[in-house]
């Protein structure tokens, strides 16, 4: 299910973050941390309500994106198809085109034979048509090139900020999510310059300074994701007590580690 897919992505990102923490490479961690936030919020949004429909919308969206890309690539006489033929050759392009058509047919069959997927697919079409009418009313261009995200289907959520509001994390949007975008869009390279008495120097690539804030953020949002999953699974009292002890232990370790990292900043 999609909630398990989210958990897998979160686990992969935490594993990558552990490697970077061990190396003292905190600057590149920001890229993964931002994605971790997106996955954590997405998981919470799915588990909050209408879980089956939202999970289905998330699962289907990736296939929709692949098919949209394939239709552009394999459209005969299009600029993209001409470039693909030059790169792959006519024979390989034709074979890949047939493979794409089989995938497209299989995906449509999956929707047609699954009641939940069919319901979500119909809701998606309605959402696209609704946005097209709105764009037409506002006289916007490219009304036939409507793109929607999985979280828009059957909800009033139109963007990631609104999804953060739905999950109670809107206060983090500007300060954390927006702030982390500097690393994503390569706008923070100048921060690696350190001014000292005798000139300017580049900081070390593996620099532990200011890592405490990133580490704290990773810990907090990882535990938030786990907490939401535990509540959704509705485990018995013994399991909940065990999880509570685990969280308390993590918090103690987090405080100790951050205090140690802050000492590095002071030095």
For each feature predicted by the language model, list its residue ranges:
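Short, hydrophobic, well-ordered secondary-structure elements
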Residues: 7-46, 174-181, 219-226
